[in-house]
């Protein structure tokens, strides 16, 4: 078969609707692989820190669901390239993903993944299971391995509500795919080691969504306190973390007003205790 550019539009539509392929990326890979990101690109040299990188994402389960939050800073080496980048994306009504690593590649992957899930639902008449969604994302990450070896690394964090357990599930990845299911909480990005240490002390099983939101904001604050690539709450510009919660009611991104209220609670507490809440020993 010739190039997709040689086919009339009507034939392309016929192939699309009658291919029987439930994976959008597999369909494009079969008929027009050059349209997939990174498939025909070769860099003369690794890009290193010359392009913006997204940093810290945190997620934790709560009673009846899961919450994910991300800071807003993007860096190019030692330069702050963007102060209000969004790194947490809705992927369908009951799932979301956050990105760390090469920002542009991560954003492109998030958009393509959302189309992937929508395409499956249209072709099959049902949604993928949570494990199926996690595996589809792993396949996309493996597809980016060539670019990752040249420096365009993307490592996402995936979270979803699972009706089978009436609760949230979290999946981490590496550059080769995965997925690796995480229990209770997880963090990725340059500030993840500090955020995870904070979560280890502050996380409480079956806490309310509101309590988990506060826990995640504390974790991002701790990450920003020790990692220069992670942005803390920007009070002067009123730039707050992106926070999303997923329950049986679906995906809900908290408004700036809602997040701002939680941030003020955290900042007030930090004024009297700069290192944050102290976990009880007993």
From Swiss-Prot:
<keyword id="KW-0888">Threonine protease</keyword>
<dbReference type="InterPro" id="IPR029055">
    <property type="entry name" value="Ntn_hydrolases_N"/>
</dbReference>
<comment type="function">
    <text>Component of the proteasome core, a large protease complex with broad specificity involved in protein degradation.</text>
</comment>
<comment type="subunit">
    <text>The 20S proteasome core is composed of 14 alpha and 14 beta subunits that assemble into four stacked heptameric rings, resulting in a barrel-shaped structure. The two inner rings, each composed of seven catalytic beta subunits, are sandwiched by two outer rings, each composed of seven alpha subunits. The catalytic chamber with the active sites is on the inside of the barrel. Has a gated structure, the ends of the cylinder being occluded by the N-termini of the alpha-subunits. Is capped by the proteasome-associated ATPase, ARC.</text>
</comment>
<dbReference type="GO" id="GO:0019774">
    <property type="term" value="C:proteasome core complex, beta-subunit complex"/>
</dbReference>
<comment type="similarity">
    <text>Belongs to the peptidase T1B family.</text>
</comment>
<keyword id="KW-0645">Protease</keyword>
<feature type="active site" description="Nucleophile">
    <location>
        <position position="55"/>
    </location>
</feature>
<dbReference type="GO" id="GO:0005737">
    <property type="term" value="C:cytoplasm"/>
</dbReference>
<comment type="pathway">
    <text>Protein degradation; proteasomal Pup-dependent pathway.</text>
</comment>
<keyword id="KW-0647">Proteasome</keyword>
<keyword id="KW-0068">Autocatalytic cleavage</keyword>
<keyword id="KW-0865">Zymogen</keyword>
<dbReference type="GO" id="GO:0010498">
    <property type="term" value="P:proteasomal protein catabolic process"/>
</dbReference>
<dbReference type="InterPro" id="IPR001353">
    <property type="entry name" value="Proteasome_sua/b"/>
</dbReference>
<dbReference type="GO" id="GO:0004298">
    <property type="term" value="F:threonine-type endopeptidase activity"/>
</dbReference>
<dbReference type="InterPro" id="IPR000243">
    <property type="entry name" value="Pept_T1A_subB"/>
</dbReference>
<dbReference type="GO" id="GO:0019941">
    <property type="term" value="P:modification-dependent protein catabolic process"/>
</dbReference>
<dbReference type="InterPro" id="IPR022483">
    <property type="entry name" value="PSB_actinobac"/>
</dbReference>
<keyword id="KW-0963">Cytoplasm</keyword>
<dbReference type="Pfam" id="PF00227">
    <property type="entry name" value="Proteasome"/>
</dbReference>
<dbReference type="InterPro" id="IPR023333">
    <property type="entry name" value="Proteasome_suB-type"/>
</dbReference>
<feature type="propeptide" description="Removed in mature form; by autocatalysis">
    <location>
        <begin position="1"/>
        <end position="54"/>
    </location>
</feature>
<protein>
    <recommendedName>
        <fullName>Proteasome subunit beta</fullName>
        <ecNumber>3.4.25.1</ecNumber>
    </recommendedName>
</protein>
<keyword id="KW-0378">Hydrolase</keyword>
């Amino acid at each position: 078969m010739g190039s997709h550019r040689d086919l009339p539009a009507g034939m392309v539509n016929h192939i699309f609707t009658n291919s029987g392929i439930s994976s959008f990326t597999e369909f494009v890979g079969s008929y027009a692989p050059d349209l997939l990101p990174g498939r025909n690109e070769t860099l003369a040299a690794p890009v290193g820190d010359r392009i913006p990188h997204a940093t810290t994402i945190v997620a934790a389960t709560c009673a009846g669901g899961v919450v994910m939050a991300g800071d807003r800073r993007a860096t190019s080496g030692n330069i702050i390239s963007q102060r209000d980048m969004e790194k947490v994306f809705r992927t369908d009504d009951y799932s979301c993903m956050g990105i760390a690593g090469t920002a542009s590649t991560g954003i492109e992957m998030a958009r393509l993944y959302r189309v992937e899930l929508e395409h499956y639902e249209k072709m099959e008449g049902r949604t993928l299971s949570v494990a199926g969604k996690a595996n589809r994302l792993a396949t996309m990450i493996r597809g980016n391995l060539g670019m990752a070896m040249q420096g365009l690394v993307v490592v996402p964090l995936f979270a979803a509500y699972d009706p089978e357990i009436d609760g949230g599930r979290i999946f981490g990845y590496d550059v080769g795919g995965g997925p690796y299911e995480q229990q209770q909480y997880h963090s990725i990005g340059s500030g993840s080691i500090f955020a995870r240490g904070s979560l280890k002390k502050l996380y409480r099983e079956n806490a309310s969504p509101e309590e988990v939101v506060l826990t995640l904001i504390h974790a991002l604050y701790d990450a920003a306190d020790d990692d220069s690539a992670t942005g803390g709450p920007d009070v002067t510009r009123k730039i707050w973390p992106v926070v999303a919660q997923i329950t049986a009611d679906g995906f809900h991104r908290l408004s700036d007003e809602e997040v701002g209220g939680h941030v003020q609670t955290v900042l007030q507490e930090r004024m009297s205790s700069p290192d944050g809440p102290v976990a009880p020993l007993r």
